[in-house]
Amino acid sequence: MLIGRKVVIRFGEDQGLSWAAAVGFYLFLSIPPLMVAATWAGGFVVSQQTSSGFVVDQVSRFLPAERQLLTAVIHGGTGSAAYTAVTLLILAVSASRVFAALISAINVMWRRVDQLSFARRQLLRATLMAAAAGLLVASVGLEAGAGAIARAFGGSRSIDWLLRSQLVPVALLFAGLVATYKLVPRTSVRISSSAIGAAAATLGIRAAHLVFATYLQAFGGFNTAYGALASVAVLLTWSLIVSIIVLLGAELVAVLDRRRIPNRGQWTG
């Protein structure tokens, strides 16, 4: 309880909600072009239909949105070479800004933001973008492995669901967060602290996904308040929720590691 209280207090001191809003906004902007780009890249290996189906399956496990909406995003953005080129450009900019905001936010929590040189910022951005691409590739292998295990158990649907819809997303999310919490701070971070923070954030995101998806199914989403913009509101709200949880996990790592520079009132956040 004491650690949790300290995390919440420091999260407020570090203007965590404002940073989460920035990260969430750029995350929201990067989701559609990421889906289109992943489908386009997958089309070089398998058929476009197979690639789009795989991308929708993967995204739906992290995003509480209707499959029809996700499918429409992909179908509306593929087929035109010019559109794909623009999409890739938008993805490069928006994804870069997601990681830029995340890097700044986490280093604010460590009181190290003033020690980030321009070169290190660019290196961290490139590293995180490469790691994200690596996790996407890893998801293909894990998906195939999960299918093979399910078939070994006689094609059990329950085992297939457990592996593909639960264990694989959790493993990918946990691995990505451990790497983020370990590599981003401008100081040495213990892997044990990073793992604890990543585990807490992963559980928080999965629990929030369940609650948010249940709310959308039970109450029809944001249709009453936002009308035709309900889908946009859902994606933006979810991006904000995820960003808050990720930054709370980062704050937990800083509290556990006990290497954060004390607040001397010299920074503005």
For the regions a language model picked out, list residue spans one by one.
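Membrane-embedded alpha-helices and immediately adjacent juxtamembrane helical segments
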Residues: 1-269
